[in-house]
Each structure stands twice: as C-alpha cells, then as structure tokens.
Amino acid sequence: MDESLAELGEHILGTLEESVLGFHVAFGELNVLAQAQSIARVLKFLRDDPACRFGTLLDITAVDYPQRPERFDVVYHLLSMHQNQRIRVTVRTNEETAVPSVVAVYPSANWYERETFDMYGVLFSDHPDLRRILTDYGFNGYPLRKDFPLTGYVEVRYDDDEKRVVYEPVKLVQEFRNFDFMSPWEGAEYLLPGDEKAEH
C-alpha cells in the first residue's frame, strides 16, 4: 500500500512540480504539501486525473502553530473510492493571507471553509459566503486557536427576566471547585480508605 501511495506522490509531484512542495507517506496515507495560492489547481488535478480520481472532499480543517510565521496549516482530506485511497493536502498561511476558496472544485467545501474560518480565523478568498457557522455572529475571537483563553471572553446565558440571551463577563466561582486533598500525587504518607486491605 505504501509503495502505491509513494508512486502516486511521485506522479503528483512530477505533474505539479511548480504547485507541490513535497510529499511523504505516514500511517497509510499520502500527505502532500502544496503552495497555498495553487490549492484550487492541485485539488482539481487530484479530482480529474485518471490516476487519482479523488472525487470526495471529506473535510477541511486547520492546525495552529503560533510560533511559526505561517501560523496555520490548512488541511484538505480527500477520498478516492475508485482507487480506495485517501490523501491529505496541506497548505500554509498566516492570519492576514487568504487561501483561495475551492468551492468551485468541490461544492462541499463551502461549509468546511466557513467552519475553518469560524474556529481558526483562516481567510478564504472568493468564498461565496464567508461568515461564522458554529459560533454567534457577535462572537469575539477564534476558539480553536492556541492563544484563545480556555474560559472564553464572555459567558452566554438566557435571562428569563429579560426574555433574551445576554452576554456577561466570565465569572469563575472558586467555592464550586473540587480539590482532592487526599491525592497520592501530593507526596503524602497517609493511607487512603481501602489501602489497608492491600497489605494483608
């Protein structure tokens, strides 16, 4: 299987050498690194080429690497039911540079790109309707970025008196925290209930 994927990677690299930066096979899947501005051309080739026939776009997501100048890996997962193979195509971008939309190549990319924008803030140029899809339209920030606070910025709740959803600053009430003072990880030398049975 890995040999056929490596051959496919060589075929893709040989045909699209100006658009593809490289490839490797890992965990039974072919991983291709492409130029961001050529992503539509690369995916169209993968869909239409007789040796590829990746007719199904399964997902688009991103990975956040805040320490890199090109902070985001935008990842496209494709499936070829004709070849019984999967491929992962990755492009790199930053917060300001838009990745070309691939809705014209795979119509299912519409909501995938919206989700990636909503969760990571990755921009897609020429998208027909790039707006939030999972969070509220007034949501502040991008929740899957590594620099997004775990508690969020605001708390959303329904106010029965006002009969509407209200936004409030996050309040963390300490008295509801459950601290385990009997934890063996604290270096204590006492016996926990039930430990006495283990000594017999």
UniProtKB/Swiss-Prot annotation:
Could you tell me the EC number(s) of this protein? Answer: 7.1.1.-
Keywords noted in UniProt: Cell inner membrane, Cell membrane, Membrane, NAD, Quinone, Translocase, Transport, Ubiquinone
Instruction: Report the Gene3D superfamilies cross-referenced here.
Output: NADH:ubiquinone oxidoreductase, 30kDa subunit
Q: Which reaction does it catalyse?
A: a quinone + NADH + 5 H(+)(in) = a quinol + NAD(+) + 4 H(+)(out)
GO MF terms listed in the record are: NADH dehydrogenase (ubiquinone) activity; NADH:ubiquinone reductase (non-electrogenic) activity; quinone binding
What Gene Ontology terms describe where this protein resides (cellular component)? plasma membrane
**InterPro entries of this UniProt entry?**
NADH_DH_suC, NADH_quin_OxRdtase_su_C/D-like, NADH_UbQ_OxRdtase_30kDa_su, NADH_UbQ_OxRdtase_CS
Oligomeric state and interaction partners are given as:
NDH-1 is composed of 14 different subunits. Subunits NuoB, C, D, E, F, and G constitute the peripheral sector of the complex.
Q: Which family does it belong to?
A: Belongs to the complex I 30 kDa subunit family.
Its function, per the record, reads:
NDH-1 shuttles electrons from NADH, via FMN and iron-sulfur (Fe-S) centers, to quinones in the respiratory chain. The immediate electron acceptor for the enzyme in this species is believed to be ubiquinone. Couples the redox reaction to proton translocation (for every two electrons transferred, four hydrogen ions are translocated across the cytoplasmic membrane), and thus conserves the redox energy in a proton gradient.
Name used for this protein in its record = NADH-quinone oxidoreductase subunit C
Please name the source species: Parvibaculum lavamentivorans (strain DS-1 / DSM 13023 / NCIMB 13966)
Q: Which gene encodes it?
A: nuoC
